[in-house]
Amino acid sequence: MSAGVTLPLFVLPMVLLPGEIQQLRIFEPRYRQMLDDCLLDGKSFGLVCDDNEETFNGWNGPKSFGCEAEIIHHETMGSNHFVEIIGTRKFKIKEVIEPALPPFSDQSMEELMPEVGIYPDLDTILEKIPEDKEYHKLYLAADVDFIEEENEISEVQLEELTSALKSVIKSIGNNINVDQEILDEWVDSRIEMIIKKDEDTLYSIAAMTISGLEQKYEILSKSDSDEIYDEIMTNLTKIV
C-alpha cells in the first residue's frame, strides 16, 4: 500500500470501481460543502459504500474499502449540483474523521429545519459547530491507504472473459431486437469498447455486467487479479 492521505468521503449505497464513470446529484449541505472544497483545491474525494452498522456523530459510516473519485465535469442547476466522476485508485480506510455536526434529524438540529426538506444556508449551519471541535467540516473524512495493484491477466483469461462477455452482449442484442444480419458486428463493436489490454479491463467488465452492491464491493475489496477474475467469471456465468 502507498503512503496514507486524508480524503473527504461521499458515503452512499453505491460502489465505484477504477475506470468507471458515474453521475451524482449533490444537494445535501454537507456534500455541497465537500464539493466546494474539492473544486476550490482541485482535489478528489473518496466514494464509499455506506455501512448501516456503524455511525459517526449520527451519520452512517463507511465500509472499509472505497475508490478515489476524480471530478471530470460539474454543473449547477438551481440548488442542485451535478457532477460526473471517474474512479481512479482503490483505498482502505485506516481511521474515520467524524463530521462536526449530527444529521438534521438530531434533536440538537431541529431549529434549523422549520420545514421538512428545506435546508438552511451553509453559513447558518456552520454557526452551530461547537468552538471546541477540531474538525469543522460537515462531511466525513478518513485517513486512507491507497492500494497498489497490477491487474495483469493472462491471454487465456482474456480469451475466456471475451467469450463470456460476447455471450452476455449477444443475449442483450437479441432481447432488444438487434437485426440478426448485423448482430455479430454489433457485439464486436461493444467488446472493443470494453476489453482493452490495460489494468482497468477487469473493472470495466465488472462495471458493465455487475449491478449488485455486494458483488461489486467484493471486487473492490480484492487486490489479487486472479480473485477478481474468478468473481467476474462467476457473475458472467450467472447472467448467461
Where are these regions (language model features)?
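N-terminal low-complexity, acidic/polar interaction/targeting segments
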Residues: 1-240
